[in-house]
Amino acid sequence: MQSNKAFNLEKQNHTPRKHHQHHHQQHHQQQQQQQQQQPPPPIPANGQQASSQNEGLTIDLKNFRKPGEKTFTQRSRLFVGNLPPDITEEEMRKLFEKYGKAGEVFIHKDKGFGFIRLETRTLAEIAKVELDNMPLRGKQLRVRFACHSASLTVRNLPQYVSNELLEEAFSVFGQVERAVVIVDDRGRPSGKGIVEFSGKPAARKALDRCSEGSFLLTTFPRPVTVEPMDQLDDEEGLPEKLVIKNQQFHKEREQPPRFAQPGSFEYEYAMRWKALIEMEKQQQDQVDRNIKEAREKLEMEMEAARHEHQVMLMRQDLMRRQEELRRMEELHNQEVQKRKQLELRQEEERRRREEEMRRQQEEMMRRQQEGFKGTFPDAREQEIRMGQMAMGGAMGINNRGAMPPAPVPPGTPAPPGPATMMPDGTLGLTPPTTERFGQAATMEGIGAIGGTPPAFNRPAPGAEFAPNKRRRY
């Protein structure tokens, strides 16, 4: 655990020491001596600082993490130079454990430098301020932010591209750690942006793909241009102690900063340099104006071409819909024709079945009529048969009348015949009763047409009726 007093002292001295680092070497050395006299004891890796017995303030290093900030990124990676040749990775971690858990530690012992990655950018800034120029085994440590080798500069960004959209667009190439759209002091987009990947392969892939193709971020058809980001140090700059003190250095430093006197040698060439710089500025402005006019002209042509393209697309869509409508109409007509043909076939089949049924009914009726005629002869045929039977019966009676009657034993009933049916022995037209018809049916020769019927026998003597009784017909 660390004393909170020493930590707050270093935070208070952060800005003044950084301000006087380039201009007041003596004040910087005094602060360095204070650091040596009061070295900050390390704190555990859990990220908390417990106060001493006199002070009850506790600082949680997790509070230095911004909302939504990613941890252990390239932005929190520090370069540590002037390391002792015998330093170990464990000593390196122990040196930075005050600022939280370290994610990556690399040491190049032969060249005396290394890299370490902390959790957040804020913790890395605090570690850089406190450990820079700190003596370690006779050497002063040099702590800087490591160059982000996987960062790209994106130009020609459309107006309505935000940080989130830029990150989403470039995340197709790999994991993006940070994406920022650069704006001016009023918050207006400048058309430039920065994209930082977690590794070099993703940055190389994005650079190659965007160089070969046209990567569009919005509906505005202007592709973005991608190039490696220039690694510039705009925080520390070039301190006096890092300037190489060679012969040219001493020659340049012979005179202090001043204004050139008119009419002097240096004034004449200073004015010529100034004219050259002005001409460069004018030409650059002219180039910028030409580029601006060309961009405006291209945008106008693009709008006209876009309108024409939209009209063409609408025409194509209309033609496609008309073709689709015509095809649907043809399909509908074909379906109607098929339905009509099916109905005609069904109607023809129904008529054929009805005709077949009608023919079958007529055939059945004809057969029934023929069968009726064969079983029951008509009235004319029946009348002719009856006439023939009557004529045959009369002829038989006349023939048998000349012959003597056969003797009949007493008590024998008279045989059925016309004598028992009619009193005069003639055949009447009235049909006989069932009993007598049955008796007549037993006679021989009645059933054959044109055959000779048997003769009627004379009645027996006992069959005579009384004088007062009439014979029953």
From Swiss-Prot:
The modification Omega-N-methylarginine is found at residue 458. GO terms for cellular component: chromosome; fibrillar center; nuclear matrix; nuclear speck; nucleus; paraspeckles; RNA polymerase II transcription regulator complex. It holds the Pfam family RRM_1. Residues 1-53, 445-473 are annotated as: Disordered. Keywords: Acetylation, Activator, Biological rhythms, Chromosome, Coiled coil, DNA damage, DNA recombination, DNA repair, DNA-binding, Immunity, Innate immunity, Isopeptide bond, Methylation, mRNA processing, mRNA splicing, Nucleus, Phosphoprotein, Repeat, Repressor, RNA-binding, Transcription, Transcription regulation, Ubl conjugation. Residues 56-375 are annotated as: DBHS. This is Non-POU domain-containing octamer-binding protein. It comes from Mus musculus (Mouse).
